[in-house]
């Protein structure tokens, strides 16, 4: 049984955010607010969502992108973080798993995900 005050706080947090619906296998672009000293800027992080975990305000998602020299870079974002300015879904992927950790071992064209076709 959860505390009613925590539930009401989480409900208020969830209502204020405009987050698109996405799943593992989708290519997303996350605009993250970064503070460096007294300056603040927005940095885009584009990659494949390979996992979504948790529930409520503690929900997180993992994005994997290929960096320089074909090195995979993974980053975990809290879904309802204040540092996330926006999330944009670029492509819907067709996958049959909720966690795509097997992509870590695949290289090049083998690591591609087919696009979901709408009928």
Swiss-Prot record:
GO cellular component, one term: cytosolic large ribosomal subunit
Name of one Pfam family that matches: Ribosomal_L19
InterPro entries for this protein: Ribosomal_bL19, Ribosomal_bL19_CS, Ribosomal_bL19_sf, Translation_prot_SH3-like_sf
Highest taxon in the source lineage: Bacteria
Entry-linked Gene3D superfamilies: 2.30.30.790
Keywords tagged on the record: Ribonucleoprotein, Ribosomal protein
SUPFAM superfamilies: Translation proteins SH3-like domain
GO molecular function: structural constituent of ribosome
Gene Ontology terms describing biological process: translation
Its job: This protein is located at the 30S-50S ribosomal subunit interface and may play a role in the structure and function of the aminoacyl-tRNA binding site.
Sequence similarity: Belongs to the bacterial ribosomal protein bL19 family.
Record protein name field: Large ribosomal subunit protein bL19
Native species: Sulfurovum sp. (strain NBC37-1)
